[in-house]
Amino acid sequence: MLAAAFADSNSSSMNVSFAHLHFAGGYLPSDSQDWRTIIPALLVAVCLVGFVGNLCVIGILLHNAWKGKPSMIHSLILNLSLADLSLLLFSAPIRATAYSKSVWDLGWFVCKSSDWFIHTCMAAKSLTIVVVAKVCFMYASDPAKQVSIHNYTIWSVLVAIWTVASLLPLPEWFFSTIRHHEGVEMCLVDVPAVAEEFMSMFGKLYPLLAFGLPLFFASFYFWRAYDQCKKRGTKTQNLRNQIRSKQVTVMLLSIAIISALLWLPEWVAWLWVWHLKAAGPAPPQGFIALSQVLMFSISSANPLIFLVMSEEFREGLKGVWKWMITKKPPTVSESQETPAGNSEGLPDKVPSPESPASIPEKEKPSSPSSGKGKTEKAEIPILPDVEQFWHERDTVPSVQDNDPIPWEHEDQETGEGVK
């Protein structure tokens, strides 16, 4: 309904000569003041919600990684949140600014890089969801198995994702430029005659590579992972791991479904624009603008899904919030009491058993020189009876001290004495 209203206002207010132009960078000229106000306001609201949500998710993941070794799924979710945050920080404000103006005044570099950067982040998210689905299937196949993944493997996967994602939309960077049309400066996709066939092929393959195939493989792995979660384990520990695996699978599957549904209108508008015939109807600009808003709203929906559906993220959010509240700078009284308590805090740091310092002095074998030194240091007088007692004790053979059956020897000694 709102899109239809936008379409009516745009068709009546927009210059008919602009209909055949392929705009870029979010530039859509229109004389409708309502259209210029509502779309930027929606984008600002999406940015605020998504910014707070993604910061919470990133803070929780970094806090968990600081406490222990990061997992592959957590690293991929972190990559997803970073891509969302990048879109909300760098792309959505530019889109809102471009929508609010009838002339392009954001510069040549922003015109060339705007669409490329958006599609790079979106393709990176799409590829990340595929890898998440694969890892989720591996985890669901054997939840009790502890998989150790090196940091090198995690970094290699992330670098590969961003490299492929940045190369796929590269033609948009090449052919987006600023042009003057009827005295108005615009950001357009200007394809020369030599590259028309190549760009026609790009317009068909890019949606398949960035959206169609990743969605197919992600659905395949999520379906297999969910099928594995239906098999009940026999042991209590396996059942607990299986329940957790099912929760993770459902959460990540929800991320994939919501992302696909909110991204689908943008692909409809994109294909419509890229395959527009000379005499064919142009897509309504209200539909194009709303499809962009829905695409950016994915970045706000993802952190909400994580925080609502994952108990781990909710507990992590509580832990981070508690850590932020309880972490206060030491007061003057506490800083003055610290030196006095240092002597009591040192024994808590017990050295390792392998080190010589871990053996207390009272348990070390005493030598005559050390015993003499301690006696002289203490200056305690030795009585004659005590000295004779220790002298007789030292002269007793060590075999009797270590005799496991001393009662038999005592009987023998007693018998010899009677004889």
UniProtKB/Swiss-Prot annotation:
It holds the Pfam family 7tm_1. Residues 1-41, 93-116, 175-201, 274-286 are extracellular. Its main location: membrane. One of its GO terms (biological process) is regulation of synaptic vesicle exocytosis. Residues 332-341 have a biased composition (Polar residues). It is found in: Cell membrane. Gene3D superfamilies: Rhodopsin 7-helix transmembrane proteins. CDD domains: 7tmA_GPR151 (cd15002). It is a multi-pass membrane protein. Residues 63-71, 138-153, 223-252, 308-419 are cytoplasmic. Disulfide bonds join 111-187. High expression in the spinal cord. Keywords: Cell membrane, Disulfide bond, G-protein coupled receptor, Glycoprotein, Membrane, Receptor, Transducer, Transmembrane, Transmembrane helix. InterPro entries: GPCR_Rhodpsn (IPR000276), GPCR_Rhodpsn_7TM (IPR017452). Residues 410-419 have a biased composition (Acidic residues). GO terms for cellular component: cholinergic synapse; plasma membrane; presynaptic membrane; synaptic vesicle membrane. It comes from the Eukaryota. Residues 330-419 are annotated as: Disordered. Glycans are attached at residues 10, 15. One of its GO terms (molecular function) is G protein-coupled receptor activity. The chain crosses the membrane at residues 42-62, 72-92, 117-137, 154-174, 202-222, 253-273, 287-307. Proton-sensing G-protein coupled receptor. Belongs to the G-protein coupled receptor 1 family. This is G-protein coupled receptor 151. It comes from Homo sapiens (Human). The lineage of its organism: Eukaryota, Metazoa, Chordata, Craniata, Vertebrata.
